[in-house]
């Protein structure tokens, strides 16, 4: 077993005792940091940054040099899997991700390959191995993937969407095609995450960014069912240590009980769910991660500290809380405000772990 100097994050996910509440930030390696912008400029474009193991490692480590974070998260993108399936991912300036060949019907789905994680996605595994080497056991490394439903939204819509009419048309008019796509994605994501674990990821997270646009019944059928399949297929132990799994559905606060039944170790919460209520509902079945509104980081330091204190009090005493934002950090947040946030979590949480 590789020794970890700081295993707070893993311990909290497994609801084991910790000295203070661990904290990291979604998108902690990102555009709010001037050093990230410099490295991205050096890479040329976003996907070149993802595909260069040394540069992906550099941006993964940048926030850890600034802040005493309790975990590193692999620098990558959720769309690496559809890109490896041959959909032609590209980024339009100011428009976000786009695909040259969106999926329109069952025949398109049938043509999609299941990517080999050590081949088409080998650059991700190289990044994982490089980051693990450079972390030198300081903190654990989180691997991740998008959920099948969320990946499918981009693959069918051809880009990001506000109304999701194209994929919902497929869901209601041709559910068989969508289920075939989701099934293929679930298999691909399982292989992808297991490869990340074998390469050195010590925990994994599934981001279901767009699950919250579904009705309760559709969420169960088209999103949660496939995340459950992935959880069932994941390696749960590696290098002599349990590998915790976190599920995060943005806008999914009403479905926490069902999510907790998947066998995952933790649930991510966005800022619209009250953490005290979430803890009451799931009890000690899973750990909880979250859930400060990322926009709170625009506030003055005293207000940020007040919000941290409120969320810590909401969760209360005991184990099983990983502090995070309710979604990714915004690109124009002052970096020193992120520092205030991280420091406040450690300082103010000590009283809850005595």
UniProtKB/Swiss-Prot annotation:
Coiled-coil boundaries: none
EC class: lyase
Alphabetic keyword roster: Cytoplasm, Decarboxylase, Lyase, Porphyrin biosynthesis
Xref: SUPFAM superfamilies: UROD/MetE-like
EC nos: 4.1.1.37
Catalytic reaction annotation: uroporphyrinogen III + 4 H(+) = coproporphyrinogen III + 4 CO2
Superkingdom of the organism of origin: Bacteria
Annotated Gene Ontology cellular component terms: cytosol
Example of a GO biological process term: protoporphyrinogen IX biosynthetic process from glutamate
Compartments it resides in: Cytoplasm
Site-annotated residues for Transition state stabilizer: 77
Pathway membership: Porphyrin-containing compound metabolism; protoporphyrin-IX biosynthesis; coproporphyrinogen-III from 5-aminolevulinate: step 4/4
Residues the entry annotates as binding substrate: 27-31, 77, 154, 209, 327
Cleavable signal peptide: none
GO MF entry, a single one: uroporphyrinogen decarboxylase activity
Function per UniProt: Catalyzes the decarboxylation of four acetate groups of uroporphyrinogen-III to yield coproporphyrinogen-III.
Quaternary organization: Homodimer.
NCBIfam families assigned: hemE
Family classification: Belongs to the uroporphyrinogen decarboxylase family.
The name this protein goes by in its record: Uroporphyrinogen decarboxylase
Species classification: Bacteria, Pseudomonadati, Pseudomonadota, Gammaproteobacteria, Enterobacterales
């Amino acid at each position: 077993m590789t020794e970890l100097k700081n295993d707070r994050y893993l311990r909290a996910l497994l609801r084991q005792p910790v000295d203070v509440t661990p904290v990291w930030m979604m998108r902690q390696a990102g555009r709010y940091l001037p050093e990230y912008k410099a490295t991205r400029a050096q890479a040329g474009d976003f996907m070149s940054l993802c595909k260069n193991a040394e540069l992906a490692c550099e941006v993964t480590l940048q926030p850890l040099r600034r802040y005493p974070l309790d975990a590193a998260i692999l620098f990558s993108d959720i769309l690496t899997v559809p890109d490896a399936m041959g959909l032609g991912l590209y980024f339009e300036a100011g428009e976000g991700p786009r695909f040259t060949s969106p999926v329109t019907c069952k025949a398109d789905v049938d043509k999609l390959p299941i990517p080999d994680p050590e081949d088409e996605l080998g650059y991700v595994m190289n990044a994982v191995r490089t980051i693990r080497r450079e972390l030198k056991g300081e903190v654990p490394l989180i691997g991740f993937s998008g959920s099948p439903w969320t990946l499918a939204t981009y693959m069918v819509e051809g880009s990001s969407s506000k109304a999701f009419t194209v994929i919902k048309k497929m869901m209601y008019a041709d559910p068989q095609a969508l289920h075939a796509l989701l099934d293929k994605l679930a298999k691909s994501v399982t292989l992808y995450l297991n490869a990340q674990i074998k390469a050195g990821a010590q925990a994994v997270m599934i981001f279901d960014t767009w699950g919250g646009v579904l009705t309760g019944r559709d969420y169960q059928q088209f999103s949660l069912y496939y995340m459950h399949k992935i959880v069932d297929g994941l390696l749960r132990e590696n290098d002599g240590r349990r590998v915790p799994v976190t599920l995060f559905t943005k806008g999914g606060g009403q479905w926490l009980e069902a999510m907790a039944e998947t066998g995952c170790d933790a649930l991510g919460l966005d800022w619209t769910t009250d953490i005290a209520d979430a803890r009451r509902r799931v009890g000690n079945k899973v750990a909880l991660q979250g859930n400060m509104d990322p926009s709170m980081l625009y506030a003055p330091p005293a207000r940020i500290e007040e919000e941290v204190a409120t969320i810590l009090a909401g969760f209360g005493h005991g184990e099983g809380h990983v502090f995070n934002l309710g979604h990714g950090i915004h690109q124009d947040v002052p970096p020193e405000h992120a520092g205030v946030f991280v420091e406040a979590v450690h300082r103010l949480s000590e009283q809850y772990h005595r």
